[in-house]
Amino acid sequence: MQVTRIIPDVPSFLASMMTFDTWSILFMVVQSLVIFLVVVIVAAMMIIYERRMLALWQDRYGPNRVGPFGSLQLVADMLKIFFKEDWTPNFTDKFMFTLAPAVAMFTALASFAIIPISPTLGVADWDIGILFFFAMAGIAVYAVLFGGWASANKFSLLGGLRSAAQTISYEVFLGLSLMGVVALTGSFNLRAIVEAQADGWYIIPQFFGFLTFVVAGVAVTHRHPFDQPEAEQELAEGYHVEYSGMKFGMFFIGEYVNVVLISALMTCLFFGGWLAPFNLDIPFIPPAFWFMIKTLFFMTMFVLARGSLMRPRYDQVMNFGWKVCLPVTLINLLVTAAVILIFSPTL
């Protein structure tokens, strides 16, 4: 009697499932996970890089006790924050209190999906890339609002309100500052914007847009000197004063991920992304090298700003945005549009 085999051979079944499209999707997922992991590692390493650079500029040693020349300080910090008590106060809204750091971390990492590291390396190649970035930035505002309100602490609430007002205001200037680049390129796709700079980086025709983008980028990431939402002297660390353990770590790493993100956007929008300077053609240097060098330069500028600039008052920050940044971005956009109409009337 012959028995009909109903269950197929498992290896052959899996092999039949692994079509070309399946392998493509699997490769894309693995590549995305690797890129996100590298971004988190770079953001964590920037913490130590910042501490060592600030120590160098201030004529002191910095962290140098854990490992040779302090090389294992990052590992020690990660272990310390991982094993700290993840304490939630009784008077908080526990759901919102837990959701806030997760939203902050998720939006920061998700925004990296649009960043083209090289012609072939990146998570997604979307025509709405810049719009996706602003969508994630808009959602990120809720993270600090949730954290400030759910903590049931007056310092947290004031820090959350400050952060929301500052972020929403400077996101307007951030968007207007790069509209000149979008007008020159005719695309919201970052890969197309980088490729359009093959004949010249946009830092020259969009210099004032770049300056406004730098200021707005620092304000949106809540970095010094625009760190009023976390002002230690006034608000005792602001909206995350009640956080500890990994929840605080997610807020902390999320801030540095945003610094890397804004630095990468500056590289792509104004400095040619992965393109070599002066159209140099050096075969043994991959395009991703130029992208990383430019991004590291802007990350260093964030550190330099922290070590050299004083923190203005909150009202001065808001006045500077609406009375200086907004007019500059609007004038830059109008001049860019006029130049395009005069020299390219068919567009």
Swiss-Prot record:
It catalyses: a quinone + NADH + 5 H(+)(in) = a quinol + NAD(+) + 4 H(+)(out). Its EC number is 7.1.1.-. It is an enzyme of class 7 (translocase). It comes from the Bacteria. It is a multi-pass membrane protein. GO terms for biological process: aerobic respiration. Keywords: Cell inner membrane, Cell membrane, Membrane, NAD, Quinone, Translocase, Transmembrane, Transmembrane helix, Ubiquinone. InterPro entries: NADH_UbQ_OxRdtase_su1/FPO, NADH_UbQ_OxRdtase_su1_CS. Disulfide bonds: none annotated. GO terms for molecular function: NADH dehydrogenase activity; oxidoreductase activity, acting on NAD(P)H, quinone or similar compound as acceptor; quinone binding. GO terms for cellular component: plasma membrane. The chain crosses the membrane at residues 25-45, 95-115, 128-148, 168-188, 200-220, 251-271, 284-304, 324-344. It is found in: Cell inner membrane. NDH-1 shuttles electrons from NADH, via FMN and iron-sulfur (Fe-S) centers, to quinones in the respiratory chain. The immediate electron acceptor for the enzyme in this species is believed to be ubiquinone. Couples the redox reaction to proton translocation (for every two electrons transferred, four hydrogen ions are translocated across the cytoplasmic membrane), and thus conserves the redox energy in a proton gradient. This subunit may bind ubiquinone. NDH-1 is composed of 14 different subunits. Subunits NuoA, H, J, K, L, M, N constitute the membrane sector of the complex. Belongs to the complex I subunit 1 family. This is NADH-quinone oxidoreductase subunit H. The gene is nuoH.
